[in-house]
């Protein structure tokens, strides 16, 4: 019988920017630390390896192109040695891990999350369905197969990236699969302070909190920190530094949190510039209490009035076909 009570953990930290091997090594340290603390699940922020591409928001596409080759070189293959190293670390620490990473597949990058079991096995990998705003100049799109909730030793586990949490239909698709534990992977929250409230920590923490309430699930809101190396590499003018952090060219923007299925915060915030791991003890039986009041895809739904249609088929960019002597055509997806 599955244990309904266990400890979960969320990372709040900066990666080693655009240095995949160093970021993987840092991640392995967090995995070992969380496992030693008794956590059964550890959540990382969005594209934590090799870090969020902040240059997209700071200057022109022409200026930003200088960073693209290095970012590609430090993005990870889903079955590559860096991911396998994370798998080995998860198995050693006996902990489930959800890692946000920049995935490279052929010549295209994706904002991806990989689910690693406490046995060190990859149980699911998903891509952000639609990159946000200027992210579309760097990353490709996911497809309907990326909306999935998987069985794990910590219950029915799902994840989304960043502003996917303000997409009502995407959220509803996830809620409909009876998600119990959700990883909300976000970048840091220093960008455009006092200039764009919609990008700030207040409203986006609220988005994760509302996800917990609407979905009746535990939410691990993982937020990165904007590291000093990001300022040093990207901010070649005072104007760019001000855009990346109006409080000064210094680390910050970490606002990780854990929410219960009733929306209640379950831990204390760390200071926004402090790296560490947040922990909370969860009890999956709390979900039944939460859903007794609100179950928007169950007893509180009216499918005869409004309903959601989801195409969960993988998107294929090429299809091979062959024609035999009897003019029969066989198609093979590739």
Swiss-Prot record:
Enzyme category, top tier: hydrolase
Cross-referenced Pfam families: CN_hydrolase (PF00795)
Domain CN hydrolase, chain residue ranges per copy: 6-284
InterPro entries: C-N_Hydrolase, C-N_Hydrolase_sf, Nitrilase/CN_hydratase_CS, Nitrilases_CHs
The reaction(s) this protein catalyses: a nitrile + 2 H2O = a carboxylate + NH4(+)
Catalytic residues in the record: 46, 128, 162
Molecular function via GO: nitrilase activity; nitrile hydratase activity
Keywords: Hydrolase
Record-level GO BP terms: detoxification of nitrogen compound; protein homooligomerization
Origin: domain of life: Bacteria
E.C. number: 3.5.5.1
Subunit structure: Homomultimer composed of 12 subunits.
Family recorded in the similarity comment: Belongs to the carbon-nitrogen hydrolase superfamily. Nitrilase family.
Entry function: Nitrilase that mediates the hydrolysis of aromatic alpha-hydroxy nitriles to carboxylic acids. Has high activity toward mandelonitrile and mediates its hydrolysis to mandelic acid. Also mediates hydrolysis of mandelonitrile derivatives. Has weak activity toward aliphatic nitriles.
Name of the protein described by the UniProt record: Nitrilase bll6402
Organism whose genome encodes this protein: Bradyrhizobium diazoefficiens (strain JCM 10833 / BCRC 13528 / IAM 13628 / NBRC 14792 / USDA 110)
């Amino acid at each position: 019988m599955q244990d309904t009570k266990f400890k979960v953990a969320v990372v709040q930290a900066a990666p080693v920017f655009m240095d995949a091997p160093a970021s993987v090594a840092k991640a392995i340290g967090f995995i070992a630390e969380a496992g030693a603390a008794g956590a059964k699940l550890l959540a990382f922020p969005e594209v934590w390896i090799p870090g969020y591409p902040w240059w997209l928001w700071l200057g022109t596409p022409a200026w930003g192109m200088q960073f693209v080759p290095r970012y590609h070189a430090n993005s990870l293959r889903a079955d590559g040695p860096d991911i396998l190293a994370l798998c080995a670390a998860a198995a050693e620490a006996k902990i489930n891990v959800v890692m946000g990473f920049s995935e490279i597949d052929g010549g295209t990058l994706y904002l991806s999350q990989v689910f690693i079991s406490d046995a060190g096995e990859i149980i699911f990998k998903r891509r952000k369905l639609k990159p946000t705003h200027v992210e579309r100049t760097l990353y490709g799109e996911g497809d309907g197969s990326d909306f999935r909730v998987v069985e794990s030793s910590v219950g029915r586990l799902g994840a989304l990236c960043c502003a996917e949490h303000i997409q009502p239909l995407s959220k509803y698709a996830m809620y409909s699969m009876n998600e119990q534990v959700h990883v909300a992977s976000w970048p840091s929250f220093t960008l455009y302070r006092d200039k764009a409230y919609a990008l700030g920590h207040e409203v986006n923490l609220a988005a994760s909190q509302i996800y917990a309430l609407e979905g009746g699930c535990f939410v691990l809101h993982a937020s990165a920190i904007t590291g000093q190396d990001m300022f040093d590499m990207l901010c070649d003018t005072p104007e760019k530094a001000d855009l990346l952090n109006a409080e000064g060219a210094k680390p910050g923007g970490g606002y990780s949190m854990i929410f219960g299925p009733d929306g209640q915060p379950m831990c204390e915030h760390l200071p926004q510039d402090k790296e560490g791991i947040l922990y909370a003890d969860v009890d999956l039986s709390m979900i039944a209490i939460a859903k007794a009041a609100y179950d928007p895809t169950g007893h509180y739904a009216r499918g005869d009035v409004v309903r959601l249609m989801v195409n969960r088929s993988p998107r294929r960019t090429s299809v091979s076909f062959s024609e035999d002597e009897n003019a029969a055509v066989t198609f093979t997806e590739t």
